[in-house]
Structures are given as structure tokens and as C-alpha cells.
Amino acid sequence: MDKQKRIQVISFQSLSANSGEGMARLGYYLSEQLHQRGLLNNFIVHSKGKFETPFPSKPVSIFSRYYLFLLNRLNKHLKIPSYKFRLLQEKLFDWFCQFRIQANTTHIFTTNAYLYRTFLKAKKSGITIILLPGTPEENYIYELVSEENKRLNITKVDAYTYRRRIDFFNKSVRLIDTVIGSLPPAYTSYSKAGYHPRVVKMLGHMKPDFKPIQLTQKEITETFTIGYLAHTVVLKGLQYLLEAWRILTNNANNKHMHLSIAGSIDETIKEYIDLHFKDLKQVTFTGPIKDAPAYMQSLDLFVVPSLIDGAPVTALEAAHYAVPVIITDHSGSGELLSRNESGCWVIPIRDAKAIADKIEWAYNHREETRQMGRNAKHNLDTYSMESFITEIADYLEHKA
């Protein structure tokens, strides 16, 4: 008789008041469905805090809440580089997680690939390992960022180019049986990676819990405001947006355009921007913002110029406020916004001219641009995240 299917769901993130942080949100809703189907062993998260779930769940360790607190306090004084601190947390999670694997488990579903010890123990027990990554394949990101660093003459190491972290990923990922590519950049990059695991295409998005709003018709004014919001590192591609902006502002016909750059900027890329774009006109660097909804509602257009980005939430937030989006073909959120009547323009990466052309078109076609924003909101509002979770649960129940 076949062993009864029992699934453990694993997320590196922690629980929140309503579900989970980051990709733990997907794990939470999937665990809920698997529990209803009688398939769930438990949901393992980094920390539960004071939160409980309507299904079996456990922190990776009874001490995790405390060691995370102590690590963060300690790091305030030691100032460990963020990429080393991240790897330390990942290895600690992996160490404790291996002891959470249950004897009757047949399948592990995880959104975290950095689990070498856990995966090794699972393989020795004949457990099938399924990964649904929230980001594209790490070696692909490494190559993109390394190429860009070379182009910009940047030598600083970060989480994407830290060799020890990449090596840990490579050891771990080769133990995985199946990768579910839910975002186009993830599916494409894992398919091309050359591993033996099967890569399954199952497109879907984690829809944020935006508060319902009543949109008012925004008056078309002379000024046309373009926005960008991110914690800017090299792969966010801000340098290409600024190159596009130089092209645009050299044309006197575009004198009523204004570019608003919001969010913190990593010191390395800031040095590059200060050196190469200090003479730009009609641009404001606002730094971190406290009121993202107000910021989005002040815009006529939003740009996501990322070299690679799994699912930029800012693009979906712009869509929530009916702001049309220019987004690269290496950013997963474009797949959702371009469904039906498209609410975005999808452009190639590293193409300043394409960015400039789309901004200029939007500037000269205001009403059509506003309709694109309404399309974006429609595509977001009518998208069913529940159907996506059900599709994953069906796959785990019947095909995994």
C-alpha cells in the first residue's frame, strides 16, 4: 500500500497578525487548504511570535523568537555586512529546520532554497522536495549583477554576489526534485539553469492586502509626474531610468515632465548616481517616504526599470491607484498587469531609449495613459489569488 501523502510546508519568514510575512503568506494560505484536504503535517516558519494558526504550525525552533531578537540587537553594535548577516540567519534556520522533519512526511513544499541540511535529511528519508521560489534563480541574478557591477565599476559585495551564499544555494538546490515557476523570471531562469529538477510553469501572484479605495477622477494638468520607488541597489536599474531622463530633458518639449525618485539608495549606487547624474534637471530625490498611498496618487506614471525582480510590489501598488506602469520583461508583476486589456508597457532591460520612448508617448497621450492605469487596476482587482493557491494545492495532492 502506498504511504499516505503528508506534506510539510516551510517558510524562512515569520507569521504576522493575519497570515505571514513575505512568502510566508503563500505558505499560510496553502497550509490552510492542505489542512482542509487532510494532507498537512505542519507549517514551519522562522518565528510565530504571539500568533496562532487554524492549522498545525511550528516555529523552526522554540528559541527562534529569542535568537532573532538577540541577533538583531547584537548586529546593531557589530554592524555585520547585511549579506553575511542574511547567510548567518539562513544557516541557523536550516540547522534547526532539519530537526523539524517528521518521520511520516512524504513531501516538503518550501519557498526557501537555502536548506542544505534539511534537504539532505529529507532525501535520506525518501521525501520529495518541491520549491516555489519568490525570486529568480540565484546564479542568474549573480551573473546579471556582476555584469552590471563591472559596467558601473562597482566592486562592493552584496547578497547577490556573495560567493559563500551562492555556493550554499548551489549545494541545496541540487537536492530539490521540482521547482514551480510561478513568475516568468523565475520559471525562465530555473529552466535555463541546467539542474536535473523538473521545472513546472504555474503562473500566479501574491496579491497584497491593499485597503479598498474609491478613486476620484484625477484632473489632467500641465505637469506630468513620473515616479520610481524602491530600496535602490544595482539590480533595480535606476541608472537606466536616469539615462532615459537625460534623453527626455534635453528636449525642450518635455519641460513639464517631472521625475520623482523615492526610497533609500544603497551607498555604492548613490556614488555612481552622484558622479554621473548630478546635472539632471526636473528630478527630485525624496528619500524614504512615510505615506506610499499619497505618493502613488500624486503620480501620472510609474516606472520599474529592474534588471531582475521577482514580483515588485510597488508595481501592484501603483496599479491599485490606477497609475499605469512601465516595467521590464525581467519583472514578474508585469505578467499580471499586462493581462486582458494591458495596464502596463513591458520593455527590455538595460534599454534607456525604450524607457524614454514610453514616457514620452504617455506624456503626449494623456487620456490613453489614464485608461492604461484603469486597465492595471482592473487586472489587479479581478485577479484571484485564491485560485492560484488552489492550483498549487491541486498539484501537490494529485501530481506531486
Question: Which residue ranges define each predicted feature?
Answer:
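Glycosyltransferase donor-sugar binding loop
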Residues: 229, 239-242, 257-271
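Short hydrophobic beta-strand element within catalytic cores of glycosyltransferases
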Residues: 324-328
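Aromatic "clamp/platform" in nucleotide-sugar-dependent glycosyltransferases that forms part
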Residues: 307
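Nucleotide-activated donor-binding/catalytic signature segment of Leloir-type glycosyltransferases, i.e.
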Residues: 270-289
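Conserved acidic donor-binding segment of nucleotide-sugar-dependent glycosyltransferases
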Residues: 339-340, 344-352, 361-366
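Donor nucleotide-sugar binding/catalytic pocket of nucleotide-sugar-dependent glycosyltransferases
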Residues: 150-213
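A short, well-ordered alpha-helix in the C-terminal region of glycosyltransferases
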Residues: 361, 368-382, 394
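Acceptor-binding helix/loop patch of EC 2.4 sugar-transfer enzymes
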Residues: 72-83, 129-167
